[in-house]
């Protein structure tokens, strides 16, 4: 973990797809933002760092294993975390779940006192772990994650149920068992029951609030 004297504090939230990571991250961001203001806290999703695949056909894009660490541009994410800690702004990539690739536009992110980083594969990369001041693993049963993923991907990402189930069986579950679950050992805090664990959220809020003092 990094020294807490750095200008920008990085908090990592990892766990299975649809485990409740984004809900915890958004809840912490919303409630802490009310206390300290937009200028002091931000959220960066690991999904923004899926590699640019604009050169591939849609058939090839659909076949990509998006749950393998090689699908992520962790080198760029690592560079961006270092830049934020130096006090420099970054250009955050924009990823389209419909087009299955990175968009041309970017979003400028200014340095903040606290950056909440959330994604499935964050703890699999030693470089990213070293940049985090502390890390969280959201530990939710896989059957619950699957039900949430079906609902999310069909309703929000334009997927069919058959395609969601096929992807889950072919890559999502195997990659969770191979990469994501073993990375739980690197987490400082393990949160059971997903994003609606109010007690865990309050404990995390208290911990993060220390960085604003």
Curated annotation (Swiss-Prot):
CC per GO annotation: cytoplasm
Keyword Signal set for record: no
Catalytic activity: uridine + ATP = UMP + ADP + H(+); cytidine + ATP = CMP + ADP + H(+)
Pathway note: Pyrimidine metabolism; CTP biosynthesis via salvage pathway; CTP from cytidine: step 1/3; Pyrimidine metabolism; UMP biosynthesis via salvage pathway; UMP from uridine: step 1/1
Sorted UniProt keywords: ATP-binding, Cytoplasm, Kinase, Nucleotide-binding, Transferase
Entry's Gene Ontology molecular function annotations: ATP binding; cytidine kinase activity; uridine kinase activity
Binding site for ATP: 15-22
Pfam families: PRK
GO biological process, one term: UMP salvage
InterPro entries in UniProt: P-loop_NTPase, PRK/URK, Uridine_kinase, Uridine_kinase-like
UniProt family annotation: Belongs to the uridine kinase family.
Name used for this protein in its record: Uridine kinase
Organism: Salmonella gallinarum (strain 287/91 / NCTC 13346)
